[in-house]
């Protein structure tokens, strides 16, 4: 199987800086959170259900898979096979273009995506170990999920439902993660879209299946 998103383009150089900034913010949020943040290897609830990823995330994941082919070819093949199998299951009801993997952005499509395939595991998730096979290349959503992060138009703090049990709203607020204060990601997404000629979001399965 070949998909339009399988075209390989260089990852923007500054993505390394973005990853460092976001990962440092996660370390700081984890320090503040202590035992309230229970994220760990094998805790996979957030690895089920497709979520939107940018073209920058796509390039990072594809580079990660390319690196995995060099270091562990058999594991890389399994990741790709899981992605291809996922697309077979998901294409019929995909709220976007199943040929390109690009999600539609209209209200109807967004509503459909909110309820789309919530039990579908991420292709990068190793079903035997519960670990991410592309952890170092994971999307920004994965890097910021868990700690308190502002989201939505109202900018409320969102946390993983498994975390911060027993913490007050004030205590949670003090653990807030500010992942990208200078909006570097937005600029790099624009660069990635210009390089790839692809505009809009996709899901992990489409970017790893090619």
Predicted regions, residues:
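Short loop/turn segments that flank or connect secondary-structure elements
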Residues: 1-210
